[in-house]
């Protein structure tokens, strides 16, 4: 099992692409929701 960390300055759009690709490759991304907009505000 592999683990990846996404830098804090990566845009939300790119972060989403990275997380989707990591899921395909079975890579754990613990910081995947670090910059995701809150769903509670809607």
UniProtKB/Swiss-Prot annotation:
<keyword id="KW-0689">Ribosomal protein</keyword>
<comment type="similarity">
    <text>Belongs to the eukaryotic ribosomal protein eL32 family.</text>
</comment>
<dbReference type="GO" id="GO:1990904">
    <property type="term" value="C:ribonucleoprotein complex"/>
</dbReference>
<dbReference type="GO" id="GO:0005840">
    <property type="term" value="C:ribosome"/>
</dbReference>
<keyword id="KW-0687">Ribonucleoprotein</keyword>
<dbReference type="GO" id="GO:0006412">
    <property type="term" value="P:translation"/>
</dbReference>
<protein>
    <recommendedName>
        <fullName>Large ribosomal subunit protein eL32</fullName>
    </recommendedName>
</protein>
<dbReference type="GO" id="GO:0003735">
    <property type="term" value="F:structural constituent of ribosome"/>
</dbReference>
<dbReference type="Pfam" id="PF01655">
    <property type="entry name" value="Ribosomal_L32e"/>
</dbReference>
<dbReference type="InterPro" id="IPR001515">
    <property type="entry name" value="Ribosomal_eL32"/>
</dbReference>
<dbReference type="InterPro" id="IPR036351">
    <property type="entry name" value="Ribosomal_eL32_sf"/>
</dbReference>
């Amino acid at each position: 099992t592999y683990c990846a960390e996404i830098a804090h300055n990566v845009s939300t759009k790119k972060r989403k692409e990275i997380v989707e690709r990591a899921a395909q490759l079975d890579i754990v991304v613990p910081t995947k929701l670090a910059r995701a907009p809150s769903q509670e505000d809607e």
